From Swiss-Prot:
Residues 163-172 have a biased composition (Basic and acidic residues). This is Autophagy-related protein 9. Residues 844-853 have a biased composition (Basic residues). It is found in: Preautophagosomal structure membrane; Cytoplasmic vesicle membrane; Golgi apparatus membrane; Endoplasmic reticulum membrane. Residues 66-79 have a biased composition (Polar residues). Phospholipid scramblase involved in autophagy and cytoplasm to vacuole transport (Cvt) vesicle formation. Cycles between the preautophagosomal structure/phagophore assembly site (PAS) and the cytoplasmic vesicle pool and supplies membrane for the growing autophagosome. Lipid scramblase activity plays a key role in preautophagosomal structure/phagophore assembly by distributing the phospholipids that arrive through atg2 from the cytoplasmic to the luminal leaflet of the bilayer, thereby driving autophagosomal membrane expansion. Required for mitophagy. The gene is atg9.
Length: 948
């Protein structure tokens, strides 16, 4: 009895359904459900701009006339799931999968056949359908949408002129390309219909764009195509990767099985040491590996060949719809691609003003309408944002379960791949959407147990896969870097950021190419910071070794120059000639010389680290006041290690990863499930996102959750607030970084911009960076113009200072509206004024430049009245007139209204929050306080702002 009780603690109860079966049933039940179940990705219906009653009438009229239209098929697809026997085809078999890209419909909407239940109205269209306020009705649809072509399947449409104009406008962009036959769209193939080859490729590209249903995967393909620099560069990269893989495997097989190494000493030619028919005499393990790699290579080849069609579609999309040729893809910026995507979205309207905002909140709108820079970044980084938050909040337990290495974390590329396989593939479905089952606490225990079993299973699989990966990567690394190290031995000590450092430095909604550019710019400053610290003993030994090895190498080199024929063959030791020792001494001299710093370097580690923080945006709270200490250097050195050490850790991680998956990660499975449930929000039209990645542009920095020592009294920390906040100012830095990358439209100003001469600081002298004007070097951090923990970085970090930035010629006291953001995403100046009042004395340095003379005021061509706190009074008054406009610039002109509210039923709550912001801005005095300040201002005769 006792043994059975013990086993029951580890084994699932008999008869209970598997968690994977529950997930599959839940996904199948929500496949055709409404907006909330499908995470905001509603079916793209051509007639979605009409009301419920209009859609019902149009559908009924279309069925009476036995017309099959795209809208009818799409509405039928939105029904609740039927029984398996009802969904099966007449032959009883499943429908054949289409070879279309993953962002296209698996089958054309017209491929479905009508049945007896087509008159049933979908549940998603019954929301408030019983109201009698929707009186307009549509007449029967015309018999033919295009009189010139009777064979084309017509679509139901209105006959009134206003609605007909909108109908035709919508139909122009989603009209399928013409063909010589009347077959449905989903059955058009160029092989069966040769006439399709003559169709305008722009129309075909427009038709594909209009029929994109999985916008996440489509935008991901668009971004990967952008990173790959076009179709030809992508194809060339894949061909070279296949050739590289074949060369590494083939050459490794040749070196290990086809050479008789004992004969090398007494042989003179290659034929003397070759093993005849070496492949036939290989061992069983070598033969198995060779066949395994061969099948993998053939599989990748077929995968690349089948993927050419998708690449061609992306090429047509860039060329014909975005106007970007294959050559321009290599030079165009991603911001320009985003602007053209938004222009393409605006040229294909899918939301009409006839539908009230109340109905749009419930029914949702076309997901393509949510496609500005913020929404695109959230779609592309839906999974990455969760990973950034997991690393930032230390949810993952990656400690090595080894007695002498328990304090060391293991995070390598192999571990990253396992986390994506175990966690992300478990939480997200094939469409990249978060499974709503994880948002229900009723399944917490089952989901946690399932995640724990996935970790254990992945650890077992790593044992079988690790030997093959270790052999391949060791050979690949040897072939790639050995020649480089031989030519430049100093590169052996070169450093790079670890995978853990990349996830710590990366910000929310920061795409990979933007993050890579920022990190690459930080490498010179990181190397200089590491070299700053005093290592006097190491430097003395290195200089001594460099002197001895250099002297020996110089004598041997001079002797070989005097008599090369005699001296190069001279053996200094047994079978070791002068040439051999020249290589040895030269390598030792180069390595020792690389350890010694330049004699002209200036020692200032604090300044070097501040320069580095401007790019990494990583400033833990524990570093405050200790930037000069060796402990901070050790913490940073863990994130910035030598390349050879990172490679060895990658190899060793393939051995230790199973132990982490077995013993460490299962301990945090409960926290992982809780994390996805508690830090997930729903955004209409986009889906479920990480709460930290959804920037509240309406209120600026007032509501950005931060956890830093400067935020409040450390003795009065609110544990709940800290739990739902990011660490080290991650979210605020991400907010400012996002505005730096996409806020390209600057505010108009009456002053003429002043462009100072370029700053050219040297890496060896901090005086060229702006501190030369200071008479004495202060020691405390605040007077060094350094960032504080949790504060923003970059150009936007000047918001809230008493002096505007000198560089760039524009004012950054409030963020400027951007053409890459929709009106509801425009940053609000209200939140930035309140944020400025919280910390008016924070002087942040910009990574784009630094003032040479901090004591001098910026040069302005025209004087403008300023308030006492140094801010432009006209800007403050204009912000006061706007009050608490939560949508920023241009909200009233938005045709979206409030249809994109994250919580459609929280109108009263938002109004209450905005009222609280008014009190905060006014200084907390309320209405009486405002009246008192206004009377005081009138008595003093001032015309400046009164604190509003």
């Amino acid at each position: 009895m006792m043994s059975s009780n013990i086993l029951s603690r580890f084994l699932p109860p008999t008869g209970s359904p598997s968690v994977y079966e529950t997930i599959r049933q839940h996904d199948a039940g929500s496949e055709y459900s409404d907006l909330e179940e499908r995470a905001g990705l509603v079916i793209e219906d051509q007639q979605e701009q009409y009301s419920d009653r209009e859609l019902e009438d149009a559908l009924a009229d279309a069925q009476d006339s036995e017309i099959v239209s795209p809208s009818t098929a799409l509405l039928n697809q939105a029904r609740s799931v039927k029984a398996p026997e009802e969904r099966a085809s007449p032959s009883g078999t499943r429908r054949r999968k289409s070879s279309r890209p993953r962002w296209m419909a698996q089958e054309s909407p017209l491929g479905y056949e009508l049945d007896d239940h087509d008159e049933d109205v979908p549940q998603s269209l019954l929301v408030e359908g019983h109201h009698e306020d929707l009186k307009p009705r549509l007449p029967p649809p015309p018999q033919s949408h295009n009189r010139s072509d009777r064979r084309r399947t017509p679509s139901p449409g209105p006959s009134s002129r206003p609605t007909e104009a909108r109908w035709n406008e919508r139909g122009v962009h989603q009209q399928p390309p013409p063909s010589e036959s009347g077959h449905p769209i989903g059955r058009w193939f160029t092989g069966q219909h040769p006439g399709l080859a003559n169709v305008d490729p722009k129309k075909k590209a427009m038709w594909r764009w209009a029929n994109v249903e999985d916008l996440d995967n489509f935008l991901k393909d668009v971004y990967v195509y952008f990173l790959g620099n076009g179709i030809w560069s992508i194809l060339l990269t894949r061909v070279l990767n296949l050739l590289t893989f074949a060369f590494v495997v083939g050459f490794s097989t040749f070196l290990t099985n086809c050479i008789d190494y004992p004969k090398v000493r007494r042989s003179k030619t290659l034929n003397d040491i070759l093993v005849p028919q070496c492949t036939a005499n290989m061992s069983g393990s070598s033969t198995f590996l060779l066949w395994l790699f061969s099948f993998f290579w053939i599989g990748k080849l077929f995968q690349y060949l089948l993927d050419i069609r998708r690449l061609k579609h992306l090429h047509d999309f860039y060329l014909y719809l975005l106007g970007v040729s294959d050559a321009e893809v290599q030079t165009i910026s991603w911001q320009e691609v985003v602007s053209r995507l938004m222009a393409l979205r605006d040229s294909n309207p899918s939301t009409a003003a006839a539908v009230s905002a109340k109905h749009r909140r419930f029914l949702g709108s076309q997901s393509k309408q949510r496609m500005d820079a913020h929404d695109i970044a959230n779609r592309l980084m839906r999974k990455e944002n969760y990973m950034i938050a997991l690393v930032n909040k230390d949810i993952l337990d990656l400690t090595l379960p080894i007695p002498f290495l328990k304090n060391r974390q293991l995070f390598s590329r192999t571990m990253e791949w396992n986390l994506n396989l175990c966690v992300m593939d478990y939480v997200f479905n094939e469409q990249g959407q978060l499974r709503t089952l994880f948002l229900k606490d009723t399944h917490r225990r089952a989901l946690s147990d399932g995640l724990r079993r996935r970790f254990i299973f992945a650890g077992v699989m790593n044992i079988f896969v690790a030997p093959f990966i270790v052999v391949y990567f060791m050979m690949h690394y040897f072939f790639r870097y050995f020649n480089e190290f031989k030519k430049n031995p100093g590169q052996i000590g070169s450093r790079q950021y670890t995978p853990m450092a990349e996830w710590k430095f990366r910000e929310f909604n920061e795409l990979w190419h933007l993050f890579e550019r920022r990190i690459n710019m930080s490498y010179p400053f990181a190397s200089r910071y590491i070299d700053q610290f005093p290592k006097d003993k190491t430097v003395q030994v290195a200089r001594f070794v460099a002197f001895i090895s250099g002297a020996l190498a110089s004598v041997l080199a001079l002797a070989s120059v005097i008599d090369p024929e005699l001296f190069l063959g001279f053996e200094i030791t047994h079978d070791r000639t002068v040439l051999f020792y020249l290589g040895i001494f030269g390598t030792v001299w180069a390595f020792a010389r690389g350890l010694a710093p330049e004699e002209t370097d200036v020692f200032d580690p604090e300044y070097a680290l501040l320069e580095l923080i401007d790019f990494t945006h990583y400033f833990p709270s524990g570093w405050k006041g200790r930037l000069h200490s060796d402990d901070v250097r050790k913490e940073f050195a863990i994130l910035y290690q030598m390349k050879i050490v990172i490679f060895l850790e990658e190899i060793l991680s393939m051995i230790f990863t199973p132990f982490v998956l077995w013993f460490s990660l299962p301990k945090c499975s409960d926290r992982l499930i809780d994390f996805f449930r508690e830090f997930t929000v729903h955004v209409d039209g986009v889906g479920y996102l990480c709460s930290f990645a959804v920037f509240d542009f309406k209120k600026g920095t007032n509501v950005l959750s931060q956890a830093g020592p400067g935020r409040r009294d450390p003795g009065k920390q609110d544990l709940r607030t800290d739990y739902f906040s990011t660490k080290d100012g991650k979210m605020l830095a991400s907010y400012y970084g996002f505005l730096d990358n996409y806020g390209t439209t600057h505010q108009a100003t009456s002053r003429r911009p002043f462009h100072p001469p370029p700053t050219l600081p040297t890496l060896g002298s901090p005086t060229a960076g702006g501190f030369g004007a200071l008479p004495d070097r202060p020691d405390h951090l605040q007077t060094r113009l350094g960032p504080t923990p949790g504060a923003p970085f970059g150009p936007q970090s000047m918001i809230g200072t008493s002096k505007p930035r000198q560089m760039g010629g524009f004012d950054h006291r409030s963020p400027a509206p951007s053409i890459l953001l929709d009106p509801h995403h425009q940053p609000s100046t209200t939140g930035f004024r309140a944020a400025a009042r919280i910390a008016p004395q924070q002087h942040q340095r910009s990574r784009l430049g630094r003032s040479h003379h901090p004591s001098t005021d910026p040069i302005d061509d025209e004087e403008e009245p300023l308030s006492q706190d140094g801010h432009d009074s006209t800007t403050r008054q204009s912000g006061a007139r706007t009050g608490t406009s939560s949508a920023g610039a241009g909200t009233s002109d938005s045709n979206l209204g409030d249809s994109w509210r994250m919580n459609p039923l929280s109108n009263d709550e938002d109004e209450g929050d905005e009222g609280e912001n008014i009190d905060a801005i006014a200084g907390g005095g309320g209405v009486l306080g405002l009246i008192q300040q206004f009377q005081k201002a009138n008595t003093e005769g001032r015309r400046t702002n009164v604190g509003i």
